[in-house]
Amino acid sequence: MSLFVAVENIEKSFPLSGGNEYLALKGIDLEIKQGEFISLIGHSGCGKSTLLNLIAGLELPTDGAVSLEGQQITAPGPDRMVVFQNYSLFPWLTVRENIALAVDEVLRDLPKEERQAIVEEHIQLVGLGHAADKPPAQLSGGMKQRVAIARGLATRPKLLLLDEPFGALDALTRGNLQEKLMQICEENHVTAVMVTHDVDEAVLLSDRIVMLTNGPGSKIGGILEVDIPRPRKRMDVVHHPSYYSLRSEIIYFLNQQKRVKKLNARKVTTVARHGLEKVNLEIGYVPLMACAPLVVAQEKAFFAKHGLDEVSLVRETSWRGIVDGLTENYLDAAQMPAGMPVWMSVGGQGGSPLPIVSSLTMSRNGNGITLSKALYDEGIQTVDDFRNLLRSTADKQHIMGIVHPASMHNLLLRYWLAANQIDPDRDVQLRTIPPAQMVADLKDGTIDGYCIGEPWNAWAAQKEIGFTIASDLEIWNGHPGKVLGVREDWANRYPNSHVALVKALLEACQYCEDPANWDELRELLSDRRYLSCPKEYIQFSQSTADDLAVPHHRFAGAGVNRPSRTEHLWMMTQLARWGDVPFPRNWVEILERVCRVGVFSTAARELGLSEVVNYQRSTPVELFDGVPFNAEDPIAYLNSLPIHRDFSVAEIALDQPRPIAAA
């Protein structure tokens, strides 16, 4: 495809009463190739239709330029046809006459017979031969929109522009017209730009989906490539492995924009009380069993006990929401996968590094690797069986789900695969999927398995759609699971609040560890505010003799909660091993700043937990394969691993200034 439409640094303002201006779009850059179908999606008021009008020439930009085939667009033209949500048909003309009016005006140089043939061709193209002589009053809404599409295509435009063309139609008619438009565009290689609010419509029709942020000053927040091959059929699209991940990405973006809008609309002030710099905290979490300490601290008033009497727990659907919440400053703290503090501190999220402090390990264990029942039915019961299957079906794509690159799920799954001579990037494909979606994807057959925290392994086993092929007891018993994370600048600004937060959660961890509290804990976690799942799927166990499918969370005990720099270093090496981040040349400095043992020790000492303060973990990091981790020479350790990507070593500058939310 060659470059066809260029939108270059567009800015568009509209005058307001009183001499003011409203900035609708700012800094829009977009290149469209010939034959592409582009969808523009975003909340109302984000400038989707404004951008479409600029491409159509119905509006002119305040700054920047739009060009078609190298020619700047300065006015409407017949090379660009717009199909609006309203049908815009002349009520006194028939279907044939409405189309002919446009054809006769635009293609006037063609012989009459040829123009008539074009009209008839496009009437048949949209399936309206039986209604060609009817006026609009005798047509349904879907038929009227077909006339509008036929009229737009009949003039042979270079670019078809659609402004929510199916928004006013019922679901059945909308679905039929989407299929028809997709067929027409594919068969005729039409270049199209469409405005839509419909996520499924965007995925079905588009080659790329452009997501616009909220206005004023709306910009492109992201562009998704739709890797679903053409020609497409609706059910093939729904069952394609990329469908749910694309859909989830768009929904996540739209939900984040909605949240940002709400946050911008309210004025948040820092509330200091009880000798603490801030007591009104927003703490993020993802609904997994490992969030139990946060739920207990809230429901059993441990937060309030330690002076944090205005805590709100913010439920996120994915770990990306946690990253965005800390990056954008609308979360004070968060439950995190154990590898995320290091990952963000070295810049894994993109952009400059964001130092994250971890002063508490909230849970250990609680993960598992699940494969589909379909694989079990094929005789896959061990990792050797799985490896043999992969080698015998090398031409087939095998997909495993993970929740985030920095999660222990990803690091443990990759380690387990590589230690069993399975390359996690070449023999399988790892796909990032929100935790709650894993089971649905496994059931639907779009993935072959996943590594995730509970209750999703137990859920799959009890629903008989998957089986646990390996638990964390087998891979690394006692590995860090979830940690408390805060921004370093937040920790420095609110040191007393930070200690109070660790104290409250440390008490909550001890509560969660006590088997006498597990029945109540199951009730709390199953509530719709938290995990929103049947409590029979929420199981706890401290016995390693139990079935491997039973979770073995550890929330407290000797060495459970104290953060370990050696463990963080191991995670740092694994992230570098697979090319997610460079290995930091200044790794000692980064570990000292990420792993704040002093804050943990202060909190534990003030709670009277001297045995926790004085405990020193003596067991080295060693996983199931018996390969010792060389914490003295991590580069040599990385080079000794038989399967790894080419990794780089770089100095990571942590002291670049970043704004923190104003008090």
UniProtKB/Swiss-Prot annotation:
Q: What protein name applies here?
A: Bicarbonate transport ATP-binding protein CmpC
Q: Does the keyword Transferase apply?
A: no
Q: Which gene encodes it?
A: cmpC
> What assembly does the database describe for this protein?
The complex is composed of two ATP-binding proteins (CmpC and CmpD), a transmembrane protein (CmpB) and a solute-binding protein (CmpA).
Q: Keywords on this record? A: ATP-binding, Cell inner membrane, Cell membrane, Ion transport, Membrane, Nucleotide-binding, Translocase, Transport
Q: Where does ATP bind?
A: G42, H43, S44, G45, C46, G47, K48, S49
User: What function does this protein fulfil?
Assistant: Part of the ABC transporter complex CmpABCD involved in bicarbonate transport. Responsible for energy coupling to the transport system.
Source domain of life:
Bacteria
- Main location class: membrane
Q: Name one GO biological process term.
A: monoatomic ion transport
Tell me yes or no: is Iron among this UniProt entry's keywords. Answer: no
Which region ranges are annotated with the description CmpA-like? 281-663
Q: Which GO terms describe its molecular function?
A: ATP binding; ATP hydrolysis activity; nitrate transmembrane transporter activity
Q: Where in or outside the cell is it found?
A: Cell inner membrane
Q: What is its EC number?
A: 7.6.2.-
The cross-references to PROSITE patterns, in alphabetical order and at most eight, read: ABC_TRANSPORTER_1, ABC_TRANSPORTER_2
- Which top EC class is named for this enzyme in its record? translocase
